[in-house]
Amino acid sequence: MASSDCEGHAGQEGETFLYFAYGSNLLTERIHLRNPSAVFCCVARLQDFKLDFGNFQGKMSERWHGGIATIFQSPGDEVWGVVWRMNKSNISSLDEQEGVKSGVYVVIEIKVSTREGKEITCRSYLMTNYESAPPSPQYKKVICMGAKENGLPQEYQEKLKAIEPNEYKGKISDEMEDIIKKGESKLS
């Protein structure tokens, strides 16, 4: 886990922006596929939101073969994630990855708290028009690997591990399979 790079950076300034990741982009290898400028900033908590998994308009993700991560407002709950500092030149690739143009996710601005209690404004994404559905085992694994790699609180990691995946046993993309293999060897 890298040291915190959030000090003195309260929001979207200059040539960079802060992005709060709570799904597959928790894993460094995953976010770097399309967004090589991403630099670990810190672990943070989004208060009064809850993690969910779903299929946009009821259609299963062709990339992940199951529900994909989203968040929704839920008083008293919390979502832990990673804040990445990224070049503004990566906004379009991040939006594309998240399906903003096709309406899968909408961009939201949120305030998250660091472990030290500092509040930071970040860009994040919220899925619209979805039906709850379990993630594939592979998608869940990528999220759990990212949580471990970046030192999310152990209790939250246990919650992630307890998520029941669907029963998909096939392959996902070669690119993602490679990322899982690299991550497993790095984290073992």
Curated annotation (Swiss-Prot):
Q: What is this protein called?
A: Gamma-glutamylcyclotransferase
Please give the GO cellular component terms listed in this UniProt entry.
Answer: cytosol
In the record, which positions carry Phosphoserine? Answer: 173
Protein EC: 4.3.2.9
Subunit relationships: Homodimer.
Annotated residues for binding of substrate:
19-22
Q: Which family does it belong to?
A: Belongs to the gamma-glutamylcyclotransferase family.
Per its UniProt entry, which superkingdom is the organism in? Eukaryota
The family database entries (InterPro entries) matched by this protein are listed as: G-Glutamylcylcotransferase, GGCT-like, GGCT-like_sf
| Organism for this UniProt entry | Mus musculus (Mouse)
Any one Pfam family here would be AIG2_2
Q: Where is the active site?
A: 98 (proton acceptor)
Q: Keywords on this record?
A: Lyase, Phosphoprotein
GO terms for biological process, alphabetical: release of cytochrome c from mitochondria
GO molecular function (one):
gamma-glutamylcyclotransferase activity
Q: Which cysteines are joined by disulfide bonds?
A: none
Q: Which reaction does it catalyse?
A: an alpha-(gamma-L-glutamyl)-L-amino acid = 5-oxo-L-proline + an L-alpha-amino acid
- Functional summary from the UniProt entry: Catalyzes the formation of 5-oxoproline from gamma-glutamyl dipeptides and may play a significant role in glutathione homeostasis. Induces release of cytochrome c from mitochondria with resultant induction of apoptosis.
